Amino acid sequence: MSRLSSLVLTLSVAGFPALAQSVTGDEAASLLFPSAPAAVEIDGQGVLAKDEAKMLAMVAQDQPYYAAIAISPDEGLMSEATIAAANHHTIEAASAAALGECNAKKKGAADCVIVAFVRPDGWEARPLQLSMAATQDFANYSGGALAISAATGAWGMGGSADEAVAACVAKQEAATDCTVAIAD
C-alpha cells in the first residue's frame, strides 16, 4: 500500500489525531521542533513532470510547517484546484485540509493527491507537535495554557484552560475543536 493510501485510510478511520493529554510548558519545550528551517518532501505521485517538481519544491520551502500541497491529477499543478494547506499542527491535518479543498475545487474526475509535504527539518513523530507559528508564539508562553485546533491550525494562549480555548476559537471562526495542549 502506498504511503498516500495509508494516510488516506488513517485519516478516514481515525480523523484528526488527538492529543491524549496536555503536557507542561517544560515538557512542551523539550518536544517542540525549532521554528525553522523546514524540510520539503516532494512525492509527485506520477503526475508531476521533473520541472514541475523542482518548481514546487522551491515554492513549498517558503510554506510554514506543517503543510501539504494537493493537486488534481486531471488538471495538473497550474490549476485553481491546487491547494497548499500550511501552518497546521500535524502533517495529517494539513493533508486532510489540502485534499478536502482541492477535491471541492477540482473539475476532473480523479481525486486529488498530495504531492508535497513540509515538516520541520529532522522531523520525527512526537507526542506534541505545533504549527510553525504556534511554535514561534510558544516563546512567549509563561504559564497558564495553550490550546490548539487540529482542524484549522489555530491556537491561543491564556492564563487558564478556558482562556486559552477562547483565544484559540477567537483566532478562527472555524476552530470549533480547540483543546488544551499545554497547561501548567
Identify the function of each model-found stretch.
Residues 1-2, 20:
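Initiator methionine at the very start of the polypeptide chain
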Residues 9-13, 29-31:
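Short N-terminal leader segment in a subset of presequences, especially plant chloroplast
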Residues 15-17:
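N-terminal signal peptide c-region/cleavage motif recognized by signal peptidases
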Residues 21-184:
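Secreted/extracellular ectodomain signature
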